[in-house]
Regions:
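Conserved short alpha-helical segments that host acidic/polar catalytic motifs at enzyme active sites
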Residues: 1-181
Length: 181
């Protein structure tokens, strides 16, 4: 490779958006066995507020209260989505996951706000994701050909669908995630 070819190759590599780590989105998770002393909702809210420089398009929180999951998410800044009134309506639990989105795939819409909450035969799963699934279009097309119905345009839903498929075949969520990889 001569110097010109080398320079062109490097320029092309620099333009490739998914070959390096990027700062996109903010993701936070918390588990507290004893939720009587501190609020997982408040801690998740404060974490998202601190992380919102990583994504100001939309945000959301899913709380798990003994297997019952509730979500609150919308477009906007953390302080716009999680008003005092909205926060007071979110039930406490022992686990929560929060996400603030910097959209790199999918449209700017409420349906693409994360975490996604997926209900299936073996229960429910909340999923938040930072980054891009580089083969999302191909996987989505394959899943749709096999009957999958998608509710948003985010690549996170592709990941959620694959993990859910694996979860229905195995004994634990941990094994399902490993199988999906």
């Amino acid at each position: 490779m001569n110097k010109l070819e080398s320079a062109c190759y490097l320029a092309e590599a620099d333009e490739a958006p998914f070959d390096k780590l990027h700062e996109e989105c903010g993701v936070f998770g918390i588990y507290r066995a004893d939720s009587a002393n501190k609020s997982v909702v408040a801690e998740t809210y404060h974490a998202l507020y601190a992380l919102q420089h990583r994504g100001q398009e939309s945000c959301g929180i899913v709380v798990n209260d003994d297997g019952v999951m509730k979500a609150h998410k919308d477009n906007g800044l953390v302080t716009e989505v999680f008003t005092r009134d909205a926060l007071s309506k979110i039930h406490e639990g022992t686990m929560a996951v929060g996400h603030c989105r910097y959209g790199t795939t999918g449209m700017h819409s409420r349906s693409n706000a994360q975490p996604l909450l997926i209900n299936h035969q073996k229960g429910a799963m909340a999923l938040a994701h930072n980054g891009n699934l580089t083969n999302a279009a191909e996987l989505r097309e394959q899943l749709e050909k096999n009957g999958a119905i998608f509710h948003c345009t985010s690549d996170t839903e592709v990941i959620a669908y694959i993990i859910t498929q694996e979860r229905l075949k195995c004994g634990s969520i941990e094994q399902a995630v490993l199988n999906a990889m």
